[in-house]
Amino acid sequence: MAKDDVIVVDGKVIEALPNAMFRVELDNGHVVLCHISGKMRMHYIKILPNDTVKVEITPYSLDKGRITHRYK
């Protein structure tokens, strides 16, 4: 899968789940299950509920995503 295949959207974290998983509500109202990208894990970037984040979603599974950026 090439990097061009991802859909990038913004969303708001509504719930923190075990194993660094998060439930994120996207700007269009959909709720997806997301995990943190490897670079964010390496740099110990903490994500809390009500944070605004950038999410990458593949067209193959629209209900799962990857958090790649946390806005300040």
Curated annotation (Swiss-Prot):
It is found in: Cytoplasm. It holds the Pfam family eIF-1a. The keyword Ion transport does not apply. Keywords: Cytoplasm, Initiation factor, Protein biosynthesis, RNA-binding, rRNA-binding. InterPro entries: NA-bd_OB-fold (IPR012340), RNA-binding_domain_S1_IF1 (IPR006196), S1_domain (IPR003029), TIF_IF1 (IPR004368). The keyword Electron transport does not apply. It comes from the Bacteria. GO terms for cellular component: cytosol. Residues 1-72 form the S1-like domain. GO terms for molecular function: ribosome binding; rRNA binding; translation initiation factor activity. Component of the 30S ribosomal translation pre-initiation complex which assembles on the 30S ribosome in the order IF-2 and IF-3, IF-1 and N-formylmethionyl-tRNA(fMet); mRNA recruitment can occur at any time during PIC assembly. Belongs to the IF-1 family. One of the essential components for the initiation of protein synthesis. Stabilizes the binding of IF-2 and IF-3 on the 30S subunit to which N-formylmethionyl-tRNA(fMet) subsequently binds. Helps modulate mRNA selection, yielding the 30S pre-initiation complex (PIC). Upon addition of the 50S ribosomal subunit IF-1, IF-2 and IF-3 are released leaving the mature 70S translation initiation complex. NCBIfam families: infA. This is Translation initiation factor IF-1. The gene is infA.
